[in-house]
Amino acid sequence: DYKDYMNEQVKKNIPESEKVRVILGGKERMDTIKNGTTAITNDNGIHDDDVIVIHDAVRPFVTEKILNDSIDCAAEYGACVCGLPCADTILHSKGGEYVEDIPVRSELYSGQAPDSFRLAHFIQMQDNLTEEQKKVITGTSQICTMNNQPIHLIEGDAINFKITTDSDLLIVRTLLGGK
């Protein structure tokens, strides 16, 4: 069973592993997040100053600065996402054949994880989503935009890149000295 295997790995590799729980994911991204928030609240309750940090395993090079800034930002503003100004021109195309629009690059940012939120408010926003909205979410911070709630932006870091392609894996191997 995958959960048993993960629990064994946690105990074997993480100091103070009693503070770590493995929570099974769900069919959709939002199901996984709901499983996590439910486990947190069942174990600990919810306090007004609690902050939840949601991060993707496909971004293993997140920095301590990003994590600390994200937590501080969410504590102050309620919701936080990190990102970088887009370096490339973005082309908007509905079918991939013709360019419909070219947005103003100076107004665009490439979103990264983590996303951080005051937990109680996040759970309320999560519970307000329709089933249709839950299916189209590509980033946790969209929960805020779908609830017409502001989300504060902090500066990310290029090293906090997402590993999704073969070329990303090549970069990782290079960073790790060819391993």
Describe the role of every protein-language-model region.
Residues 1-49, 129-132:
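Conserved N-terminal catalytic core of the sugar/cofactor nucleotidyltransferase
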Residues 6-10, 70, 172:
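Hydrophobic packing residues within well-ordered alpha-helices of enzyme cores
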Residues 18-21, 109, 152, 161-162:
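Structural signal for short hydrophobic segments within the conserved structured cores
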Residues 41, 45, 72-75, 177:
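Residue-level signal for alpha-helix termini/capping positions
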Residues 52-53:
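Short aromatic/hydrophobic "clamp" motif used to bind/position activated sugar donors
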Residues 56:
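Substrate/cofactor-recognition hotspot
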Residues 61-154:
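Conserved core of the sugar-phosphate nucleotidyltransferase
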Residues 160-179:
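Hydrophobic helical membrane-anchoring modules
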